[in-house]
């Protein structure tokens, strides 16, 4: 037996030796290959451990996942082991990584700003700024602006192999510093000082290729998936130095006879080779960032459902982690992420920085203590100065030396951000025998320079970096990461993929074009079309013109699609992903098939059905012409989009381009009627070439060869061309096609240049008061000043603001409690979940929730994502728009009634939605005016508003513009406080707050929570949802409602001193881990109640709570609170709203007036556009009104009216859509708060347009009427003004109406576009009413533009009895007779026309108001 066992063992050993020998032979064979081949092959083991030789580029997705699982199996816990293996491999052959040391010396960044009301974007300020900017550019004036110092001569060193944390309160200069170091500062800032990488100036290297700046803004293409986004970024950036490093590593390992780890070898080769469709590095980065679960999900936007905001933030980081940059500047990358995810990402950055000797600076808002401990160095900034730069573990010693100590239970990062703040500093003063005096940032910076760490830093900066130690691969001197031909291929594949993803848009455009073609076919039906007279020819000419306008207009969709993508393109450009032409060339080439399909469809549907010349060659020629026109159109509107760069501006530019091209195209106004000073415009109009080419192609054909008669030998076609001043040579067809193709090339070149050299429009600056600017300068310079006693009292005590304790306010309120029992909430199961096998019809989101909120008690509502925190708050506040609610809610013992509850409660939404063009004080006055009782006079309202501003610390910002979130105006933290203030001025008894500290830095969160505590101390009832709060924030609450995933309650009760009650409760449960000393109770609570812990312990925390004494006590409390006291009275109000409908309307109109006045991108651009159009059309149509000798001259006058109405109207409608969309979104919050009814808001939006449209129509009518020399009588001018006014008005109301009936302005613009085409077709200009087929005449009367043209022409010419020569050149009739016989216009119908244009205004405005009232596109 022993012998057999011995034999078995020897066989086993021999088998093992054979395997090892086989592996050695396999590696030996691999090592014998040439280096080029060797680094492209590796040994891969499958799931059972069977080795095989593979091509690195041929790894399948399943093999990649298996490899990653083996390499980084425990990435969630600690990636250190993986990086240690990487480092060990390089150390084994003594191969060093390229290191980069970044230095900045005396870095000064300054800007020039306007102060106070001069900074508000009003129309006068907008005009003055434009004029000043123009004069400044030509060095005529400097302009009166105030200097604002952003970075104040700072110096420092960022060393490789050390992870650096950048901290500082808002507006301290963190982002500016990171942008400056990355070489990405805007040209509008004045910069001085020196920045070097390894001793080399930024001008000597390509900084964006050497370093990478991760922006706060998450700009991505919505239609791409997460994986596609990362793959594209990785392929564009290339592999950098990694390929050369791999070659050297392979060479040294071969010489040393080292056999590398198989899996690591494949991974590193994949990393260095790049160019693969799905590279391992992308899979690895997705795994590290937690994006592997949504890898194939679209990024999405407001139109496309996609990944969450936190996932987008991680994707922004991942885009640059897949690249080869050795220096990373990461700006607030944790926004929207929970602390565990942030900790995981920072841990990865720490180990990669240490192992690969990278240079990394990361700016974070609220790093948890665990995350803070991962950093090696800290840079602390305040007011543009560096307060401290050095090792993390020495920073507290520095502040201790100045008399400021961090409390034991305080997060160090929070302490650092607060200790430099004037309002927070006092609480950290720790020298009892010395009175506290405020130490401004300037003094801290001065003290640091005298501190040993500061002296050491200064000494290092004195010695220049020795360039001999610069690794040859460290700094990038090439513009792009891969060859330009490869970048072109990458872009081609990317845009081809985007076209597939956007297939719906292209199909929708095609269907839209097909429908319009079918309508056109039935309007210009060959059975009603003849070839007998010049008037017949005019109808054919009109059909050709309409076809070309439709094809031209079809390219307009490029404007919104391009403008939406521009931020991403600018980001790619600035990061040197690819040259601009590598994007524009594929976009041009890929548009060719769509042009072919759409042009072919139009020609195929309309050519023979309309009755054009039957010769097939002419059919093909029309197709070629329309294809060339479509290509030119796409190029033209890409130019307009890249030049406009903002949706409203680009749309206006696009409309203007259409106007110029169409007006000077030779159809609206004939060539011989265009004044000599505008004839150059005719020759450069692309539509002119298309018009002439299409005309000769048709009218020199067989159908038009009969003699025109009237003493001429010319054919009918030739006579028509001469009559309309069109060219008559056959060669003009080829001139037209060549010109259109030439314009296509020109426009695409201009598009490329604009994309390469233009930058996004600058943001509106926040409003800075003179006092604020002066105080900022004092702090910066370190001037000493003592905090006044009142201010000290107000802000001392950090979060627990003592000043407002038991303090009364101007307006009294009634303290109320809110109790609720057995709250259940159900929603219908989505179809997607049903398809996954869920059988129930309803999904329960809240399960028997019972609790109470009391006056003077601050309650926290806490739970993991998906626990139902916001859902519970929405249910209690009555904000849910769908689902089924069960349970009882009582207000101080009385059943809750939503009509009255909205009057005594406030709801602070997480989104911070406000009207962007109001100032802070105006927003508060508006809320107070509509929500306070009607018997409170305006003086008391103002006093109360100012009291609330003081309470929430907004007094210094009272004149600041609110702006749009993430775009301009107030910072995130300031917007949070404004949201709270807007609800507080309603004098509510109960306030709900949804995530009031999300997205804020520690200091800002402390300010907000201090605000909340101040409000509670006035005796109000407040409940806040909160997500993983810091110790300070968590322990500022009095009570806690803690929910677990699934909508069940697991704790409801007091927190206690230092959370002792909470800790006592959970530690009493058997098996729950005890809290560690100094640990955050909120984080501990979430950890020990996680679903994994429930599974480990085999318990249900919800069941434990339901059986606890605490739950029983809560039920008893709710039993008491659910019954009114003897003296209590139920709250009742005589009306639903505090103000009458008229008062609501006046208040809404007041707000809209301010909003319009301060929105120059909407209002001023409209006026500017109107002035330009009136001057342009006035000079083109010079004295047209007095020329009435021929039918063509009358047609020219009609053309000028048609062009103005259509283009000013469509521009107004398009521009109004985004404005109304934003205001409607704000109104959802305001109406839910019971501020006003839908109708006063809607009619205020309607009425505010009256003066602006009146100004527009007066500007246009006065200028154009005078220049065109229409009959100068008061009656005729007033009729002209009347029709222009109401025509522009109904277009504007139509744009507003389409927005009101659709979810957003993008959908509205899609819905509106076909109607513009139909209004154009049936306006009576291209085909007179009498020539419209009988089956379509009803639509002529339903067309507002037709009534406008009717009214304008009849009011000017309907009573004119002078003779006019007809198009045959012989016969004459009176002007009014011509209008009646040819156009079908009668002077008797002038009054009807006037009534109809007014009726359309009324109709569109009423539909708008009804839609605002009836439709709610906000889903809660």
UniProtKB/Swiss-Prot annotation:
Binding-site residues for ATP 2, renumbered to this chain: 863-870
Pfam families linked: ABC2_membrane, ABC2_membrane_7, ABC_tran, ABC_trans_N, PDR_assoc
Cysteines joined through disulfide linkages: none
Tissue-specific expression: Ubiquitous in aerial organs. Higher expression levels in young, expanding tissues than in older tissues. Detected in the epidermal layer.
Gene Ontology cellular-component annotations: peroxisome; plasma membrane
Result of knocking out the encoding gene: Chemical composition modifications and structural alterations of the cuticular layer of the cell wall leading to increased permeability of the cuticle, increased sensitivity to herbicide (glufosidate), increased cuticular transpiration and increased resistance to Botrytis cinerea.
ABC transmembrane type-2 domain segment(s): 486-699, 1143-1357
Protein's membrane topology: Multi-pass membrane protein
InterPro entries: AAA+_ATPase (IPR003593), ABC2_TM (IPR013525), ABC_trans_N (IPR029481), ABC_transporter-like_ATP-bd (IPR003439), ABCG_dom (IPR043926), ABCG_PDR_1 (IPR034001), ABCG_PDR_2 (IPR034003), P-loop_NTPase (IPR027417)
Record localization: Cell membrane
SUPFAM superfamilies found in the cross-reference section: P-loop containing nucleoside triphosphate hydrolases
Main location (coarse class): membrane
Record GO biological process: cutin transport
Annotated residues for binding of ATP 1: 168-175
Domain of life: Eukaryota
Signals that turn on the gene: Repressed by cycloheximide (CHX) and abscisic acid (ABA).
Stretches assigned to the ABC transporter domain: 135-408, 818-1070
Keywords: ATP-binding, Cell membrane, Membrane, Nucleotide-binding, Repeat, Transmembrane, Transmembrane helix, Transport
Stated family: Belongs to the ABC transporter superfamily. ABCG family. PDR (TC 3.A.1.205) subfamily.
Function: May be a general defense protein. Required for the formation of the cuticle layer of the cell wall.
Protein name: ABC transporter G family member 32
Gene source species: Arabidopsis thaliana (Mouse-ear cress)
